[in-house]
Amino acid sequence: MKFFALFIYRPVATILLSVAITLCGILGFRMLPVAPLPQVDFPVIMVSASLPGASPETMASSVATPLERSLGRIAGVSEMTSSSSLGSTRIILQFDFDRDINGAARDVQAAINAAQSLLPSGMPSRPTYRKANPSDAPIMILTLTSDTYSQGELYDFASTQLAPTISQIDGVGDVDVGGSSLPAVRVGLNPQALFNQGVSLDDVRTAISNANVRKPQGALEDDTHRWQIQTNDELKTAAEYQPLIIHYNNGGAVRLGDVATVTDSVQDVRNAGMTNAKPAILLMIRKLPEANIIQTVDSIRARLPELQSTIPAAIDLQIAQDRSPTIRASLEEVEQTLVISVALVILVVFLFLRSGRATIIPAVAVPVSLIGTFAAMYLCGFSLNNLSLMALTIATGFVVDDAIVVLENIARHLEAGMKPLQAALQGTREVGFTVLSMSLSLVAVFLPLLLMGGLPGRLLREFAVTLSVAIGISLLVSLTLTPMMCGWMLKASKPREQKRLRGFGRMLVALQQGYGKSLKWVLNHTRLVGAVLLGTIALNIWLYISIPKTFFPEQDTGVLMGGIQADQSISFQAMRGKLQDFMKIIRDEPAVDNVTGFTGGSRVNSGMMFITLKPRGERSETAQQIIDRLRKKLAKEPGANLFLMAVQDIRVGGRQANASYQYTLLSDDLAALREWEPKIRKKLATLPELADVNSDQEDNGAEMNLIYDRDTMARLGIDVQAANSLLNNAFGQRQISTIYQPMNQYKVVMEVDPRYTQDISALEKMFVINNEGKAIPLSYFAKWQPANAPLSVNHQGLSAASTISFNLPTGKSLSDASAAIDRAMTQLGVPSTVRGSFAGTAQVFQETMNSQVILIIAAIATVYIVLGILYESYVHPLTILSTLPSAGVGALLALELFNAPFSLIALIGIMLLIGIVKKNAIMMVDFALEAQRHGNLTPQEAIFQACLLRFRPIMMTTLAALFGALPLVLSGGDGSELRQPLGITIVGGLVMSQLLTLYTTPVVYLFFDRLRLRFSRKPKQAVTE
């Protein structure tokens, strides 16, 4: 009593307290960062190593395995995968959430150092690492194009000047430059000319290496001067290399230009990048795991003018893709939804109270509670994201509930003739415990979410804390500011209502009277109501089991990512043509704004494409609908597949897959894995629950297997090293020398001119100089035959692995797909030597599925404990919790009606309903207990009176919560696919619970009262409890 009086009779102090809360919230709002979702990125580090010319199997056994054994000892590694292809190995380390990325990076470097002695001596450089997830979509893509400069020169500008500068920007984790390679002098040898001159490829290599030398020459010095010695020992351009004498034949000089074509070109000609059908260099920028995407993008944009000033005017630097506009648009949509929710909630209050003066009170309480929450969000290190803003939107209905309960009770006393200040004090005292019970029990719902681990726990923590803080501030405001404003603003008379609102008042009275009559009938037919309640419980269980489930709603971020997978024996020239063909098909799509792509490198048969769609306001279809239409057109392209998927804000794992979800096969028996993977993949491809089924196992690449005749080699004076050196010199794009320039280092690359390697007959033109100086053709001591060979070798942990990726067809959920995969694996009878498990997002979904029911039960148990403590009763909490089954049925039926799968967002809605719908029962039970204690009423009379007296606030609070969530259901635009499942769940649950709990709660109350009387020794205890 004194607590309430302290604020009611000191209006200045109460107003200033509310102003302080509001100002703190405004300050916090201005400092809060912006993000699409809470920070849920796993710390990921990528280790890269190269050994030019080495086969995938050689890279896996000699490079990947030693590194994996060393890296696997690092603490906190939750997953380690590797992929070895021609000349390169990449190892992805995913760490636990609580692992500091910088500390992990130090451990990675130490592990690399420890494994260095076990690595091949021919590696051109030590393994390196990057603090970025290669499977993440870039947050920004920059392109360089020019009509003047070559691709190699553009790549040089990008890698030498732009990439290092961008990498230094806060939040940037990795800048991957693609589309070409560094400039180089390429020596294309003519094998016939070499044979005619008696010059071996090793002779050419040695001559070039010896002619381009950078060594210190020392200095000359006398008594007064010092001269640094400088020579022309370096060759820098193709023109300088052409006249180089490499051999003397019969006294005549054989120059390099006589036996080779020397050009200024690039290190690796098997790379191509394009933007909108124009050759381009791509800078793909990825953020650090802990970085904020909006702040990082803004920082990059702020540096762009400076970057443009460092490159020639003839080079065009453009932003091809930027993830931030759709994120900003999505958050603007949520903010608009929040404003609409506030307006609708205040409108509900006005319609019920029919007084502008009374409506002002909750109209003040709601903004104070919501704005004050921003200060707590800032102190907790949160961000303004879709989930935290959705929490505030839903909180609109909650925070007004407290004010409504207090205001409505005070207004009831005023209408009875009580003076305003007395009515404020008396009304607040009567419902203070009710408001406290409603708020604490609602916050209790979120305690299991706060204790939940893993990615779901991190994802939902900001939502739960934000909503809990808003409810806490609302509780304070409703017990301080609201009664003070009621006492000083409201008058002791019935509200003067406008004529147009009298109809609503009469309708409300008629509705209350009708409810009273129906309630009397229900209280005389309690068994029927009990059967209905039991039926809702059973229906809940059936609906939950049968409803399709997924991890997170599929987002339309306006960005698509595509992986190209072609025949494993395809040439680079043909692959570049496929890239161009796919880009043309996509550019013809009206909804596409920009498309970039690249191919080449160590895996010639693969490529990547990044597609930016037009803003949602400029297209009528969702990203998934566009993918479905493009899928049919792309399927007509022979010899290659382009698998498209919408970029999501949540992606788990470090695998670079061509689809959204993965299923990984593991085995310690590589032969068994290679036998069963194609069978499993083909089986999964036939399932209607899956689309775009593909695999990273590529073991059917074309290989030419050379078989040496060692006896013949010994007789001819040739050793294996000389023969292998010949092949590397001829076909391996061998880097034989280094050209040093002020800004970078470039290579001299030697190979047989591609004009002479168009078919297998090129091997017949190769020869080795033996120990007697004679040219011995390769065909004299070797035979060759075509064979199959892997293009890549993949590991997970220390086991051989193969990952099958898939997307979901329209209308299918992740639960449908996972169940279908489990059935297929059982039908195939896969041996125990091959183990299958879901990976990435699909794995998190499986883990979440296992904990959902436990989470809901824990929330209900927590609410029961809190209510039991507040009411000092084992029974009354059960009465209050009896409202939940009807809400669950309504929520699940609504999801089914809208064809929305049960996702993590829908789970939030279920958890919220646990807190919302019990408010009705709390108001009924509180007033019924009060009537029994002080009104000497029977339990049936007490609960009947409580239901009628609290009918108006129950309707007000329910409609306020419903209208607060309704904009989420009706919202469109960016991010609506995240908001709608939450709104659908809440609105469906509220409608169903409102229809049933007005009748089931009094019946359950009387049932437990009779039960308590039956087992009680003192019947009066039922009244006094």
From Swiss-Prot:
Q: Transcription regulation: is it a keyword of this entry? A: no
- One GO cellular component term, please give it: plasma membrane
Enumerate the transmembrane spans. Answer: 3-23, 333-353, 360-380, 387-407, 431-451, 463-483, 528-548, 853-873, 875-895, 897-917, 953-973, 984-1004
The record's subcellular locations are: Cell inner membrane
Q: Which GO terms describe its molecular function?
A: xenobiotic transmembrane transporter activity
Q: Which UniProt keywords apply?
A: Cell inner membrane, Cell membrane, Membrane, Transmembrane, Transmembrane helix, Transport
Coarsely, its chief localization is membrane
Q: What's its membrane topology?
A: Multi-pass membrane protein
Q: What does this protein do?
A: The MdtABC tripartite complex confers resistance against novobiocin and deoxycholate.
- What family does the database annotate? Belongs to the resistance-nodulation-cell division (RND) (TC 2.A.6) family. MdtC subfamily.
NCBIfam families (UniProt xref): PRK10614.1, RND_permease_2
Subunit structure of this entry?
A: Part of a tripartite efflux system composed of MdtA, MdtB and MdtC. MdtC forms a heteromultimer with MdtB.
Entry protein name: Multidrug resistance protein MdtC
Q: Which organism is it from?
A: Escherichia coli O81 (strain ED1a)
